[in-house]
Structure formats: structure tokens, C-alpha cells
């Protein structure tokens, strides 16, 4: 059996490319999504492959980023949002908890919100205490949310692909220290 070894970041990138190639309704956006550094390398080359309409940056307003995603999902889009730090998602909790997580229940299972919210966790260089928290347990206690945290590249790719296909919101945690690990 010959398995290709990838970094965690390349596995995320590969999953995004695969999902976006298979379904033109998959959109990837967030702060830095179209940046030359590509959110720790995870979105590199996506804008060139899929264009500005499907891979784009947005103004810094986490609540609006998330609300936009919910709106797109109601138009049958599957969105992948990236918040480069988990703490930024706290500014979108109203949308995540009161809208996305409850939408399927509020509509008797007739409408879903197929969004993936990628949250980067872990301390980085020069990061203060406001940018180095692990808030997984907060999200794990919200009915209607699925919470994922892959420990290796192989699992990250498979779990991200599954998350994108899920009909309901998924919080996808990525530890920044894992992005350059190989598995």
C-alpha cells in the first residue's frame, strides 16, 4: 500500500480542492483566504483554481462573516469560513449558537445550514493570552453543532471532507502547531 505523506496544511488544502472541484456550490472565504500565505498554507492556490467568486477575503466582522455563510447556505451553498484565531469566533457566537446551530431544529428538519467554520487554536509567536486559548469545550456544549479536531493530516483531510458534506454546521478546530507536521 503506497500512501502519500502530506503536511497537515497540505491535507486541508487537498480536501478543499477536492470538495470545490466536485461541487461548484462550495465556497471558501474568511480573513486571509486569498492571501499569498494562504491561512498557514491551507488555502494556497485555491483562488487561482476557482476564482474570486468562490475564494475571497472579507472585511473584519466575524459576526457578518458567519451571517453571510448562513445566508448562502439557505441558497444551497456549502461554505467554509476561516477564523484565523478561535477567539475571533467569539464575536460571531450569536450567529453560531442562535442561528446556525438551531436552524435545522427551528425548521422541523426541512432546512439545514451546511457550513464549516475552521477555527485555528494554539499559541503562536508573539501571541498574547487573548490569542492562545483552547475553547473547544464551549462549542462542544452547543446542541446542533458538531465539533471536530483532527490530530494528523490523514484524519484532517477525511474529516474536513465529511464536514463539508454534512447538512448542519461543523466547527473544525486546527491547532496551528500541526499545520507543518507530516503524516
Q: Where does each model-flagged region fall?
A:
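Thiamine diphosphate
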Residues: 2-178
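Glycine/aspartate-rich loop-and-adjacent alpha/beta segment that forms the canonical ThDP
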Residues: 180-183
Amino acid at each position: 500500500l503506497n500512501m502519500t505523506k502530506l503536511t497537515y496544511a497540505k491535507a486541508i488544502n487537498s480536501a478543499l480542492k477536492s470538495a470545490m472541484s466536485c461541487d461548484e456550490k462550495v465556497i471558501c472565504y474568511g480573513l486571509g483566504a486569498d492571501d499569498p500565505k494562504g491561512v498557514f498554507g491551507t488555502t494556497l492556490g485555491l483562488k487561482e483554481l476557482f476564482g474570486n467568486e468562490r475564494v475571497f477575503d472579507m472585511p473584519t466582522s466575524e459576526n457578518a462573516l458567519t451571517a453571510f455563510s448562513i445566508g448562502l447556505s439557505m441558497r444551497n451553498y456549502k461554505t467554509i469560513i476561516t477564523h484565523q484565531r478561535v477567539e475571533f469566533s467569539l464575536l460571531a457566537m450569536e450567529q453560531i449558537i442562535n442561528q446556525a446551530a438551531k436552524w435545522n431544529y427551528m425548521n422541523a428538519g426541512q432546512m439545514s445550514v451546511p457550513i464549516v467554520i475552521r477555527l485555528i487554536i494554539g499559541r503562536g509567536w508573539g501571541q498574547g493570552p487573548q490569542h492562545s486559548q483552547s475553547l473547544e469545550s464551549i462549542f462542544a456544549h452547543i446542541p446542533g453543532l458538531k465539533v471536530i479536531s483532527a490530530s494528523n493530516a490523514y484524519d484532517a483531510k477525511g474529516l474536513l471532507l465529511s464536514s463539508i458534506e454534512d447538512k448542519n454546521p461543523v466547527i473544525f478546530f486546527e491547532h496551528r502547531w500541526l499545520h507543518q507536521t507530516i503524516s
